[in-house]
From Swiss-Prot:
Activity regulation remarks: Activated by a myriad of ligands such as acetylcholine, cytisine, nicotine, choline and epibatidine. The heteropentamer CHRNA3:CHRNB2 activity is blocked by alpha-conotoxins ImI, ImII, PnIA, GID and MII. The heteropentamer CHRNA3:CHRNB4 activity is blocked by the alpha-conotoxin ImI and AuIB.
One GO MF term attached to the UniProt entry: acetylcholine-gated monoatomic cation-selective channel activity
Name of the gene: CHRNA3
NCBIfam families the record matches: LIC
Species this protein is from: Homo sapiens
Membrane topology, Cytoplasmic segments: 267-268, 327-474
Signal peptide: 1-31
Record note on quaternary structure: Neuronal AChR is composed of two different types of subunits: alpha and beta. CHRNA3/Alpha-3 subunit can be combined to CHRNA5/alpha-5, CHRNB2/beta-2 CHRNB3/beta-3 or CHRNB4/beta-4 to give rise to functional receptors. Forms stoichiometries such as (CHRNA3)2:(CHRNB4)3 or (CHRNA3:CHRNB4)2:CHRNB3. Part of a complex composed of STUB1/CHIP, VCP/p97, CHRNA3, and UBXN2A that modulates the ubiquitination and endoplasmic reticulum-associated degradation (ERAD) of CHRNA3.
Disorder cited: Bladder dysfunction, autonomic, with impaired pupillary reflex and secondary CAKUT: An autosomal recessive disease characterized by impaired innervation and autonomic dysfunction of the urinary bladder, hydronephrosis, vesicoureteral reflux, small kidneys, recurrent urinary tract infections, and progressive renal insufficiency. Additional autonomic features are impaired pupillary reflex and orthostatic hypotension. The disease manifests in utero or early childhood.
Keywords: Cell membrane, Disease variant, Disulfide bond, Endoplasmic reticulum, Glycoprotein, Golgi apparatus, Ion channel, Ion transport, Ligand-gated ion channel, Membrane, Phosphoprotein, Receptor, Signal, Synapse, Transmembrane, Transmembrane helix, Transport, Ubl conjugation
Disulphide-bridged cysteine pairs: 159-173, 223-224
Cellular compartment(s): Synaptic cell membrane; Cell membrane; Endoplasmic reticulum; Golgi apparatus
Protein name (record): Neuronal acetylcholine receptor subunit alpha-3
Entry comment on modification after translation: Ubiquitinated; by STUB1/CHIP and thereafter degraded by the 26S proteosome complex.
Length: 505
C-alpha cells in the first residue's frame, strides 16, 4: 500500500511543504533585497536637478530618436497635425553606475522618471497642450550609467497646410525638438539614424507617409547669445484621395456633364432652364460641403474649389445661353424679321459644318394653282341661274352646249391667253372684272380668294417660324460641342495639375 500512487504526496507533510516554499522564494527575496540596496545606494545623495556631469563645463550628450506610432489627424482648418510619438532619449549619468556583482548580478534597473535628471526636450512648434512630455513612465538604468527613457506622447504640432491641390495634395509638416533651457554648452543632441523610426507605425486611413528625414541644427536666437541645438523632422505626407474622389469629385463630374445635355434637350419640352438651375443648386450644395473640409484661408484656392467655381460659371453661362436660345426659338414674323446674314450663316453655312441635315420642303412637288381658261370662265357664267334664263331653249345650260353659252365663250376667249400667263389671284381678279359674271359667282370667288390668301400667309408665317426654330437648333448644337470640349479640357487641365507639379518637383 505504501508503494501506491498516493505514497509521494502523503510523504510531504505540512512542515516540509512550508520549507520547500521558503526555499523557492529565497532567490526572489535575494533579488528584491539586492535591488532595494541598489536603489538606496544610487539615490541616497542623488539630486535630480543637477546635470549628471563630473565637470561643469562638460555637456551632456543626448542621443535622440523619434518613433512614429500613429498619425492621428491632420486638421486643415486649424492647420494642426496630431501625432502619437515615442521619444527615445539616451544619455550617461555617472552617478548611476554600479558593480553588478555587488548586487546579485543586476545589470539593469527600472526607476520612476521623476527620480532622475532628465533633459527638458520639448516640441518647439507645439500648438495645443503641454510642451513637455509626461514623466510618469519609468527609465531604464544600466550598470554602466547609461539611461534610456522612452516616454510616449501625443503632440499637436503646427503645420502650414497648402491646399492648392486638395484633395491630391502633399504636405510637409516639420517637428522641431530641442532643450528649452540648456544651450549647446550644457546639452548636445545627437540624432540616432537619419530619419524617423516608422517600424511601429500604424497606417492611417487618410494619409500616407512618404518619408520623414531628420536633421540637426545649431541655431542662435535673437533672445540669447548662446547656441541652441535642435533636431527637426520633416514629415512628408500624401493625402489618400479615394474618399474625396468617390464622394465629391465623381458626383461633381457627373453633374457638370449634365450641363452639356441641356443643349441637347429640345426647346419645346420647356425643361431646359429647370435643368440648368437644378444643376447649379446641386453644385452650390457641394460647395457648402467642401468649405467645411478645407482651411479658411484666402492665400490659395484649392483645386476642388477651382473646379466647382469653373463648373458654376459653366452652368451659369449655360442658363444665359439657354434663355437666348429659347428667345430665338419662339420668335415669329410679327415680332422679328430674320436678317439675311442669319439665313446665310445659320441656315446654310453652319448646318453643313455641324453635319446637320434639314428635311426638304414638299412645296416644290405640290401642285400649283392652275389659271382659269376662257371656256371655264364661260361655264361659270352659264352655271348661274340668271344667265341660264337667257338660254333660247329656256332650260338650264348643261356642259355649256347651248347657243347662248357658245356665244359668250367666243366673247371672252380673247382674255384666255393673258389669263394663262397670270397667277391664280390675277385669274380671279380677271374673272371678277368680267361684267358677265353673276353676283353669286363673284362672291364665291372672293371668298375662295380670301381663304387662299389667308392659307398662303399662314404657310409663309409657319415657314419663317420653322426657320427661327432651326436657327435655335443650330445654336444649341454649336454650344453642345463647345461646352463638351470645354468641360473635358477644363476637367483634364485642372486635375492634371497635381501630376505635373509632382513631376516638376
Amino acid at each position: 500500500m505504501g508503494s501506491g500512487p498516493l505514497s509521494l504526496p502523503l510523504a510531504l507533510s505540512p512542515p516540509r511543504l512550508l520549507l520547500l516554499l521558503l526555499l523557492s522564494l529565497l532567490p526572489v527575496a535575494r533579488a528584491s533585497e539586492a535591488e532595494h540596496r541598489l536603489f538606496e545606494r544610487l539615490f541616497e545623495d542623488y539630486n535630480e536637478i543637477i546635470r549628471p556631469v563630473a565637470n561643469v563645463s562638460d555637456p551632456v550628450i543626448i542621443h535622440f530618436e523619434v518613433s512614429m506610432s500613429q498619425l492621428v489627424k491632420v486638421d486643415e482648418v486649424n492647420q494642426i497635425m496630431e501625432t502619437n510619438l515615442w521619444l527615445k532619449q539616451i544619455w550617461n549619468d555617472y552617478k548611476l553606475k554600479w558593480n553588478p556583482s555587488d548586487y546579485g548580478g543586476a545589470e539593469f534597473m527600472r526607476v520612476p522618471a521623476q527620480k532622475i535628471w532628465k533633459p527638458d526636450i520639448v516640441l518647439y512648434n507645439n500648438a495645443v497642450g503641454d510642451f513637455q512630455v509626461d514623466d510618469k513612465t519609468k527609465a531604464l538604468l544600466k550598470y554602466t550609467g547609461e539611461v534610456t527613457w522612452i516616454p510616449p506622447a501625443i503632440f499637436k504640432s503646427s503645420c502650414k497646410i497648402d491646399v492648392t491641390y486638395f484633395p491630391f495634395d502633399y504636405q510637409n509638416c516639420t517637428m522641431k525638438f530641442g532643450s528649452w533651457s540648456y544651450d549647446k554648452a550644457k546639452i548636445d543632441l545627437v540624432l540616432i539614424g537619419s530619419s524617423m523610426n516608422l517600424k511601429d507605425y500604424w497606417e492611417s486611413g487618410e494619409w500616407a507617409i512618404i518619408k520623414a528625414p531628420g536633421y540637426k541644427h545649431d541655431i542662435k536666437y535673437n533672445c540669447c547669445e548662446e547656441i541652441y541645438p535642435d533636431i527637426t523632422y520633416s514629415l512628408y505626407i500624401r493625402r489618400l484621395p479615394l474618399f474625396y474622389t468617390i464622394n465629391l469629385i465623381i458626383p461633381c463630374l457627373l453633374i457638370s456633364f449634365l450641363t452639356v445635355l441641356v443643349f441637347y434637350l429640345p426647346s419645346d419640352c420647356g425643361e431646359k432652364v429647370t435643368l440648368c438651375i437644378s444643376v447649379l443648386l446641386s453644385l452650390t450644395v457641394f460647395l457648402l460641403v467642401i468649405t467645411e473640409t478645407i482651411p479658411s484661408t484666402s492665400l490659395v484656392i484649392p483645386l476642388i474649389g477651382e473646379y466647382l467655381l469653373f463648373t458654376m460659371i459653366f452652368v451659369t453661362l449655360s442658363i444665359v445661353i439657354t434663355v437666348f436660345v429659347l428667345n430665338v426659338h419662339y420668335r415669329t414674323p410679327t415680332t422679328h424679321t430674320m436678317p439675311s446674314w442669319v439665313k446665310t450663316v445659320f441656315l446654310n453655312l453652319l448646318p453643313r459644318v455641324m453635319f446637320m441635315t434639314r428635311p426638304t420642303s414638299n412645296e416644290g412637288n405640290a401642285q400649283k394653282p392652275r389659271p382659269l381658261y376662257g371656256a371655264e370662265l364661260s361655264n361659270l357664267n352659264c352655271f348661274s341661274r340668271a344667265e341660264s334664263k337667257g338660254c333660247k331653249e329656256g332650260y338650264p345650260c348643261q356642259d355649256g352646249m347651248c347657243g347662248y353659252c357658245h356665244h359668250r365663250r367666243i366673247k371672252i376667249s380673247n382674255f384666255s391667253a393673258n389669263l394663262t400667263r397670270s397667277s391664280s389671284s390675277e385669274s380671279v381678279d380677271a374673272v371678277l372684272s368680267l361684267s358677265a359674271l353673276s353676283p353669286e359667282i363673284k362672291e364665291a370667288i372672293q371668298s375662295v380668294k380670301y381663304i387662299a390668301e389667308n392659307m398662303k400667309a399662314q404657310n409663309e408665317a409657319k415657314e419663317i417660324q420653322d426657320d427661327w426654330k432651326y436657327v435655335a437648333m443650330v445654336i444649341d448644337r454649336i454650344f453642345l460641342w463647345v461646352f463638351t470640349l470645354v468641360c473635358i479640357l477644363g476637367t483634364a487641365g485642372l486635375f492634371l495639375q497635381p501630376l505635373m507639379a509632382r513631376e516638376d518637383a
